[in-house]
Amino acid sequence: VAAIQTVLG
């Protein structure tokens, strides 16, 4: 996924 990496930082 990609949206998850955004919240991870």
Swiss-Prot record:
It is found in: Secreted. It comes from the Eukaryota. One of its GO terms (molecular function) is cellulase activity. Its EC number is 3.2.1.4. GO terms for biological process: cellulose catabolic process. Its main location: secreted. Optimum temperature is 30 degrees Celsius. Keywords: Carbohydrate metabolism, Cellulose degradation, Glycosidase, Hydrolase, Polysaccharide degradation, Secreted. Disulfide bonds: none annotated. Has endoglucanase activity on substrates containing beta-1,4 glycosidic bonds, like in carboxymethylcellulose (CMC). Induction: Induced by Co(2+), Ba(2+), Mn(2+), Mg(2+) and Cu(2+) ions. Repressed by Hg(2+) ions and methanol. The keyword Secreted applies. It comes from Aspergillus versicolor. This is Endo-beta-1,4-glucanase. Optimum pH is 4.0. GO terms for cellular component: extracellular region. It catalyses: Endohydrolysis of (1->4)-beta-D-glucosidic linkages in cellulose, lichenin and cereal beta-D-glucans.
